[in-house]
A protein has these predicted regions:
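Conserved ABC transporter NBD signature motif
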Residues: 58-74
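Helix N-cap at the start of a conserved alpha-helix in ABC-type nucleotide-binding domains
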Residues: 166-168
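Catalytic Walker B motif of ABC-type/P-loop ATPase nucleotide-binding domains
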Residues: 155-159
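The feature captures the beta-strand-to-loop junction immediately N-terminal to the Walker
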Residues: 35-37
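Helix-to-loop junction immediately C-terminal to a conserved catalytic motif
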Residues: 50
């Protein structure tokens, strides 16, 4: 089975925490969940995969090619949604749309706003609020829309349903299926 990400002997050491060594792979064309106790290192692992946090040792192979998330078009191929603040607290929806369109070639503002509509964020009241005044669930909807509005091969989502109500979690599961199905076996979710 082809792998979208392969992690070998991966370690990350902090003062009070050590991750690894970790050896695992994520298959292409599937949604794979990382399950573990709070504080086990799931977020750290995802941050390393996305190039947000540096690894102490080991390798991460992306799409069978490289161990460097900054090389080539790797960052264009990976969409990321954190469980915490991804953008400055004073930003509004329009600021996020602008920054994402400048940062990523394959970000669609039209798709972003359409997804916000599906997720119930585009009413006048919510779309003009700064992130700091949105509920956690509303912020997560904005973060998810920003990730799904990019044309990527891999989505890395950190606890995407944790702050969503049951209806929004159902919509999120539908979005996962649509994303995987639209990739003809080439798209994956972690």
């Amino acid at each position: 089975m082809e792998e979208v990400i392969k992690v070998s002997d991966l370690t990350r050491k902090y003062k009070d925490f050590s991750l690894g060594p970790v050896d695992l792979s994520f298959p292409k064309g599937f949604a794979t969940a990382l399950i573990g106790a709070n504080g086990a290192g799931k977020t750290t692992l995802m941050d390393i995969i996305c190039g947000i946090t540096a690894k102490t040792g080991g390798t991460v192979t992306y799409f069978g090619e490289t161990d460097n998330p900054d090389k080539g078009n790797i960052k264009e191929r990976i969409g990321y949604c954190a469980s915490q603040a991804m953008f400055p607290a004073n930003w509004k929806v329009r600021d996020i749309a602008l920054s994402m369109s400048l940062a990523f070639d394959k970000f669609s503002k039209d798709r972003f706003y359409s997804l916000l509509g599906e997720l119930g964020v585009t009413d006048e009241k919510n779309s003009k609020k700064p992130l700091s005044s949105m509920s956690d669930g509303m912020k997560m909807r904005v973060f998810l829309a920003s990730a799904f509005a990019r044309d990527t091969d891999l989505l890395v989502l950190d606890e995407p349903g944790s702050s969503l109500d049951p209806l929004m979690r159902d919509r999120l599961c539908d979005r996962f299926r649509d994303y995987i199905d639209s990739g003809n076996g080439e798209r994956s979710i972690i």
